[in-house]
C-alpha cells in the first residue's frame, strides 16, 4: 500500500473513532462507526490473499450487522423519547438492542466467534489495530450509556466472555488466536465493572491496550506468529523473547505484574457491591488464561523444541529494527503494581 493512501486511511480510522467519542448525537455516532469500519477494511486486506479476504468479509458482515442493530435500537428509542441525545434512553428494549450491538462490535460472548478468525487471517500490524484501537469507540459509548444498561445482561455476557476467553485459548498454537481469546476475556472483565464503576473500566482498557500493543510490537520485531517460531526465537533473541513471555504473564494477570491491577480492583469493587459469586467465578475462570500463558512460557523458556544444530543460542547482539516506543510501553505494561495505592481516587 502506498504511503499517501495509508496516511488517508489511518486518518479516517482515527477521525471515525474521535467522532464516536466526542458526539452525544446518535446519528453522528453511527456515522463515526461506519467511517471507522469502512476505513479498516483495506488495512485488514493489506496482505492480499484468500485468508485476508475471508477475514475482512467476516469483519465487515459482523460490524454491519451490529451497526444495523444499533440503528434499530436508536430508532425505537427515538419513537419513545423523541430525542437523538445519547443520555436519554427511556425504553428497555432499545437499551438491550444497543448493548447487544456494542458488545457485538467488541467481540463479547456470545458474539465472539469473529474475533479469533479475523485476527488469525490478517497481518500482525492489522491484528494489533483490531485488538486495540478498534475497541476504543464501542467502549466509549458503553461508558456513556452505562447508567441505562441492563446490568444482568451485561454481567452474563461478561462471565461467559471470561470463560470463553480462557477455554478457547487452551489448545491454540497460533499467537494471534491466543491474543484474540485474551482480548475476549479482557473485554469480559471490562463489561463486568462498567455499570458499577465506569472509571475503573477506563483504567482496565488503558492497561489492556498498553499490554497488547507491547506484545504485538515484539511479535513484529522478531516475526513470531506461532509458539514454535517463538521457541526458535528464544535461541536467536533471548532478551526480546523473554520480554514477550513476561508481557504474556502480565496479560494473564499474574502478580506482581501490571495486569494484576485491573483484576484485583474489579474483584474488590464487585465485592463492595455485595456480589460474591460472580467475581469468584470470574477469578476461577481467569486461571484458564493464566494457565495457557504459563504453559507457553514454560514450553518456550524451559524446554527446547526440536531444531537444527545451527540454531544454538546467540550471545552476540544482532542488528534489529529500532523501536523507540517499546521500552516505555514494556515498563508500564509490567511494573505499575506499586502505584496501585494511588488509584484509591477511583472509589
UniProtKB/Swiss-Prot annotation:
Cellular component GO terms, alphabetical: mitochondrial inner membrane
GO MF: NADH dehydrogenase (ubiquinone) activity
Protein origin, superkingdom: Eukaryota
UniProt keyword list: Electron transport, Membrane, Mitochondrion, Mitochondrion inner membrane, NAD, Respiratory chain, Translocase, Transmembrane, Transmembrane helix, Transport, Ubiquinone
Assembly description: Core subunit of respiratory chain NADH dehydrogenase (Complex I) which is composed of 45 different subunits. Interacts with TMEM242.
Purpose of the protein: Core subunit of the mitochondrial membrane respiratory chain NADH dehydrogenase (Complex I) which catalyzes electron transfer from NADH through the respiratory chain, using ubiquinone as an electron acceptor. Essential for the catalytic activity and assembly of complex I.
Protein name: NADH-ubiquinone oxidoreductase chain 2
Classification lineage: Eukaryota, Metazoa, Chordata, Craniata, Vertebrata
Amino acid at each position: 500500500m502506498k504511503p499517501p493512501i495509508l496516511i488517508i486511511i489511518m486518518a479516517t480510522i482515527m477521525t471515525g473513532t474521535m467522532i464516536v467519542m466526542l458526539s452525544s448525537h446518535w446519528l453522528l455516532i453511527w456515522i463515526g462507526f461506519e467511517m471507522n469500519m469502512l476505513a479498516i477494511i483495506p488495512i485488514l486486506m493489506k496482505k492480499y490473499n484468500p485468508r485476508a479476504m475471508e477475514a475482512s468479509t467476516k469483519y465487515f458482515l459482523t460490524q454491519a450487522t451490529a451497526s444495523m442493530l444499533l440503528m434499530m435500537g436508536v430508532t425505537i428509542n427515538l419513537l419513545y423519547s423523541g430525542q437523538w441525545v445519547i443520555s436519554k434512553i427511556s425504553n428497555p428494549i432499545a437499551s438491550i438492542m444497543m448493548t447487544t450491538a456494542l458488545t457485538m462490535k467488541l467481540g463479547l460472548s456470545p458474539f465472539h466467534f469473529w474475533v479469533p478468525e479475523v485476527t488469525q487471517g490478517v497481518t500482525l500490524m492489522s491484528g494489533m489495530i483490531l485488538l486495540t484501537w478498534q475497541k476504543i469507540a464501542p467502549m466509549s459509548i458503553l461508558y456513556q450509556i452505562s447508567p441505562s444498561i441492563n446490568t444482568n445482561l451485561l454481567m452474563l455476557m461478561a462471565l461467559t466472555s471470561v470463560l470463553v476467553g480462557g477455554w478457547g485459548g487452551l489448545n491454540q498454537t497460533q499467537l494471534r488466536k491466543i491474543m484474540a481469546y485474551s482480548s475476549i476475556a479482557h473485554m469480559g472483565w471490562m463489561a463486568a465493572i462498567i455499570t458499577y464503576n465506569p472509571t475503573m473500566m477506563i483504567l482496565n482498557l488503558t492497561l489492556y491496550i498498553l499490554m497488547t500493543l507491547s506484545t504485538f510490537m515484539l511479535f513484529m520485531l522478531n516475526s513470531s506468529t506461532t509458539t514454535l517460531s517463538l521457541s526458535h526465537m528464544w535461541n536467536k533473541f533471548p532478551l526480546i523473547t523473554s520480554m514477550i513471555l513476561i508481557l504474556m504473564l502480565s496479560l494473564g494477570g499474574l502478580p506482581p505484574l501490571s495486569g494484576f491491577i485491573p483484576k484485583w480492583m474489579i474483584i474488590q469493587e464487585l465485592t463492595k457491591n455485595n456480589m460474591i459469586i460472580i467475581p469468584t467465578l470470574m477469578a476461577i475462570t481467569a486461571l484458564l488464561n493464566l494457565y495457557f500463558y504459563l504453559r507457553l512460557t514454560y514450553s518456550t523458556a524451559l524446554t527446547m523444541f526440536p531444531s537444527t544444530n545451527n540454531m544454538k543460542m546467540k550471545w552476540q547482539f544482532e542488528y534489529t529494527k529500532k523501536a523507540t516506543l517499546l521500552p516505555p510501553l514494556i515498563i508500564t505494561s509490567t511494573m505499575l503494581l506499586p502505584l496501585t495505592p494511588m488509584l484509591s481516587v477511583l472509589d
